[in-house]
Structures are given as C-alpha cells and as structure tokens.
A protein has these predicted regions:
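Short beta-strand edge/turn micro-motifs at domain boundaries
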Residues: 118-202, 288
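C-terminal motif of bacterial Sec signal peptides marking the signal peptidase cleavage site
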Residues: 17-20
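Bacterial N-terminal signal peptides that target proteins for export
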Residues: 1-8
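Surface-exposed, charged secondary-structure patches
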Residues: 69-153, 246-288
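Core segments of small alpha/beta cavity-forming domains
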Residues: 23-81, 193-253, 260
C-alpha cells in the first residue's frame, strides 16, 4: 500500500512534466507555421515562391519563363485576403514528425479557374483570328499569368474556407530541435485554395459553356478578325478581284447577321453533344 502511495505522485509528476514538454514543443511548432503563413498574408514574394512555384500552377507548361513583376502581382492579388486558423497540433517526438491541422481562408479558386478557362479559350480564338501570321500563336506561360492578372484585377471573388494539414519534420542543431514545414504538392494546392487542381480539370467548363464562349467570341469579332478566322481568302482561291469582293461580302454578311441560341446538352463518357440554332446567310440561295 505504501508503494502505491509513493508511485502515484511520481507517475503524476512524470505526466505533468511530459505534458509540459509536449505543450512547449507544440507552441514552438505553431510559431513556425504562423511565421511562414503570416509572410504569405503579408504578400512576401520569397515565401510565396518557397511554397508555390509559379511554374507549378500550370504544370503542363514546360516553358522556363523568368519571374516577372506581372507574375509577382498575380500572387499578391491572390493572397491579399488570405488568412488561416490553427485547429490542432500533434507531435510524434519518436519519429520527429508533427502535424498541424488548419482552416484556410482563400478566394474562390474554382470560380477563378472557370473564368480563366473561358478567358483562355477566347484568347486562343483571338490568336487564330490574328492577321499577323508571322507571330507564334502558342499560348505562353506569361500569357496565362496575364489572363490571371486581368481577372484578379477586374473581379472580386468571394472568400471560401478549406481545411488542410501541414506536416513538419524535426532536426537537431546545436542541441536544439528545429522544426521545418515539409513542402508537398498537396500543400501547394491547398494554399491556393485548390487552384492547381481546378486549372487542370478538363471538365471545369460544361459543354454548353464551352460552346457559348466559342460562339460569343465569334459574334463579337470585327469583320477583319472574322475573315481571318474563317480564312476567307481560301473561299475563292483566285486573284480575280470580283470573286475576292464576293468573299469579303459573304464575310460581311456573316458578321452582320450571325446569331445563335443554345439548346439541350447530352453527355456520354468523354463525348458531349450540344444542340444549337445558328443564324447565318443562306449559302444555297447565294450559290444558286
């Protein structure tokens, strides 16, 4: 009985000491996370690039472009309303690993990705309608960030919440435990509100939205742009000025009366069919 009475205070003391050490370590870990995420809140460019590479936002683009002020501005605009809240911190001292659960507050990345996909499609159509055939019509990484910049500058996106976890690893330096955030693709995607996943989603736009962007872009082209896009010169394939005038007149006719309405959509696997009524000139009547 005396042994039990002696052991109980000892065990209680050990438990208190362990909890105290663990609490101290959790506080240190929280401070590391706060320090890094506060730099994102304060639009620190170096910290942004540490966790979110501007090239990895568009992983399919292999272009190695220099980090420009325009690209930096995109991240500044994106993170201007960024915030976070630490929910829980757990430490595994044996494995020198810690995990911090967070709630992130970011702009609505899905809405931004939808707008970007529409803007990119318009940009690609505009390139095809350009009369400067010597220019490379490939969409560059800088073009993509230019579009993001325009969207973030001209639109106000809602703030959304997202839960995520951050893993930290420990190392010993001068008999002191140093905690460091482990950079992962998942963390990168979480910090930008899922933007990386949304931008790579081929279904981010519905079939009808895709067709709507396409037809609306055609409808709003100038006569010259429409002629370039339709390759009007190939309609007559001749130097005859009368036939060239006819081709130009046809393009002018399309430009004046072109209209559309979109109907039902059916989707089967990777294929979609969208019904649309197109208003244009009566080609049969002209040819006859």
């Amino acid at each position: 009985m005396k042994s039990v009475k002696f052991l109980l205070p000892l065990l209680l003391l050990c438990a208190v000491l362990f909890c105290g050490c663990t609490g101290k370590e959790e506080k240190k870990i929280d401070e590391v996370v706060k320090r890094e995420l506060d730099l994102l809140k304060h639009l620190d460019s170096d910290t942004t690039q540490k966790y979110i590479s501007y090239q990895e936002i568009f992983p399919g683009d292999l272009e190695d472009a220099a980090m420009s002020s325009d690209i930096e501005e995109v991240f500044s605009l994106f993170f201007q309303d960024f915030d976070y809240k630490i929910l829980d911190t757990s430490v595994n001292r044996n494995k020198a690993i810690a995990k911090v659960s967070l709630r992130l507050f970011t702009l609505d990345a899905r809405a931004l990705a939808e707008d970007f996909s529409k803007a990119l499609l318009k940009h690609e159509i505009a390139l095809a309608a350009s009369d400067d055939t010597e220019d490379d019509q490939t969409v560059t990484l800088e073009d993509r960030y230019m579009l993001l910049n325009q969207l973030l500058s001209s639109n106000k996106y809602q703030t959304v919440e997202r839960n995520c976890s951050i893993t930290l690893t420990a190392s010993e330096k001068n008999e002191e435990t140093i905690w460091e955030i482990k950079r992962t693709t998942t963390l990168e995607n979480d910090l930008v509100g899922g933007l990386m996943n949304y931008l790579s989603d081929p279904d981010i736009l519905s079939p009808e939205d895709t067709l709507l962007v396409y037809l609306d872009t055609l409808k709003n082209m100038s006569t010259e742009e429409l002629a370039n896009y339709l390759n009007a010169d190939s309609i007559v394939s001749t130097e005859d000025p009368n036939k060239i005038s006819l081709a130009n007149a046809l393009v002018e006719q399309v430009h004046n009366i072109f209209n559309y309405s979109i109907g039902e959509t059916s989707v089967s696997g990777y294929h979609a069919s969208v019904k649309a009524d197109i208003t244009t000139f009566d080609s049969e009547a002209i040819l006859n």
